[in-house]
Amino acid sequence: MAHKTLLGSSTSHDSCLDLWREKNDQLVRQAKVAQNLSLSLRRQQLVQDVLEGLRGLLHSLQGLPATVSVLPLELTVICNFITLRASLAQGFTEDLAPDIQRGLERVLETQEQQEARLEHRLRGLWDSVLHVSSLLPELLPALHHLAGLQAALWLSTDRLEDLTLLLQTLNGSESSASEELLLLLKTWRPPVETSDAPLTLQDARSLRDVLLTAFAYRQGLRELITGSLPRALSSLHEAASGLCPRPVLVQVYTALATCLRKMGKPQRALLYLVEAVKGESIWGPPLLEASRLYQQLGNTAAEIESLELLVEALSVTHIPEAPQLLIEVELLLPPPDPASPLHCGTQSQAKYLLASRCLQTRRVEDAAEHYLDLLALLLDGSEPKFSPPPCPPGPCVPEVFLEAAVALIQAGRAQDALTVCEELLSRTSSLLPKRPRLWEDARKGTKESPHCSPWISAIYLLQGQAWVQLGAQKEAVSEFSRCLELLFQVTPKDKEPGPASSCEHGCTSDVVLQQLRAAALISRGLEWVAGGQDNKALQDFLLSVQVCPGNQDASFHLLQTLRRLDRRDEAIAFWQRLEAQTDLPQENATWSLPLYLETYLDWIRPPDREALLEEFRTSLL
C-alpha cells in the first residue's frame, strides 16, 4: 500500500517503469552510436553524457523502495553503468565494488533481510542473494549479468578463491577445488534474456566468454613463469580457442611459442610465431621470442634479424584505437610484468640486446654501430630511464659504455673508443673515494656506487688497449698503470650473503676486481714483451698469477716469459704445476663476468694453450 502511495497508482507505476526502461534503452543506443565514432571530442562528450545519464537513472531508481517488479531494470542499469565505467577506465578496480554491493542489498531489501546486509561483506551478500534468487526467477538473468561483472572484478584483483566459490554457487557445484575454476567458467550457463528485457551494453554470455579467455590466458602465463609447461600449454590452447582479439591472440601465440621452445619443440614454436607476426601491425613480443628461439637453434643471422625488427617495432609510435564500450579481454589481463617472457621492454633495451648479441657473435662492425646508436638514445633523453633487460639480467649504464668501448676497439676504431671512455670518465670520476677504502666500506657510502672503482679501472684498462691498437706503447703502459693503481687502492673484504645487484651478472664484485687486476697486469706485461723488456714483463705476469690464483692465461704468459729468459729450472717447475692444473676446473669458471670483461679477457688469452703445453713438453724436458 505504501508503494502505491509513493508511486501514485499501479498504472503510474507501470508508466514510470516504462519511462525508466525507455531511458535505459535510449542511453544504450546512444553508447553504441558513440562506439562507432573514431577518437574525437564528440565521441568523448557523447560517452560522458551516457555515463551521467546512467548515473542519474540509477539515482532515480534507488531513491525508491526496492520492488521485485523494478529490480530487473535496476540491476540492468547497474550492469550498464559498471560496464561503461570499467571500459572508460580501461580496467576493473575496487571502487566498482560499492555499485555491485548496492545492487545486492536492494535484492535483499525486497525479502526484508536487513540483517544479511549488515552482517556480511560482498562474498556473504552473494551467498544470501543467490540463496533467495530461487524465489525470484525473474531476477536471474540480471543477477547472472551482475555476477559476471563481479567475476571480472575478482579476476582482475586476483581474488580467485572468492571467484571460485561464486561460480560454484551459480553452477550449483559442491566441489571446492580451486583448480577447477577454468571448468567452472566453461560450464557456467547464464540464463538467456527475454526479447522484451531492457537493453544492455554487453550481455552475460558475452561477458562469460571474455572471462573464460582472460582467465585461461592469465593462468597459462602464470604456469609458464613457474615452469608448469604441460599445464601452461593446455591453458594457453584454451585461451587461443576463445574470444581473442588480435592483440591478445598475438600474446597468446607468443606464450605458446615460449612454452614449446622450453619443452624442446622449436619447430612447433616457430609455427605459432609465424602466426603471431602475420598482419599489418608489427608486435614486439613475438620478435623477441623469435630471437630467443633462433639463438637456441644456433641460427645467428635469423636471431640478429629478429632483434633488428624488434628495435624497429619499438620505435614506431602506435596511434591508440578507440576503446570498445564494453568489457574486453585486455581489461582483465595483468599489467606488464618485467619478469614475464612477453615483456619486450623499451627501444633502448631492445637496442642493447641487439648490440650485445652482435658483440658476443663477433659481428664487430655491427656491434660498434649499434652501441653508438644506443649511447645516443641514452644521452639525448628521448628514451625513458634505461634499466637492465630483465632476462637475462642486463648491465648498468656505465657497463653499457664499457661494452661500447670494447666493441669499438674490436672493430678497429680505437679513437672512437677513447672518446666513449672519456665521456664515461667525465660522468663517474667525481664519485671516486679520496682515500683507499675497504670494498665493503665503499658499499656503505651514500654517494659512491660500490662498482665505481671497478668501472673507472675498466675505463683505464680499455684506454690502454685502445692506445695499444694505435701503436702508442708509452700511453698504453701509462693507462694500464693507472688502472692498477686504482684497483690496488680497494681491498676486497669477505662478502656477506645476499643477492647480487644487476650490475654483477651473478658474479661477486670481488671476482670482478680480481679479474680486472689480472687483465691489467697481463696487458701491461704484454706491452713490456712487445718492447723487449722481458724482466719487467716477468714481474707483471708473476704478480698476475699471485692476485688471481688459478688464472691459466696469466700462468701461460709467465711460462713463456720464463722460457724466453732461459730460466729453465723455474720454467720446468712451473710447467709441471700448470699441467696439473689443466685437469682441474678453472677457478671462477662458473661465474658469469660482465660482457666487457669477458670480451677483454678473450683478447689476452693465448690462442692455443694445448699446443703451447705440448711445445713446452718437448722443448723443456
Where are these regions (language model features)?
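Non-TPR docking regions that flank or precede TPR/alpha-solenoid scaffolds in eukaryotic proteins
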Residues: 1-621
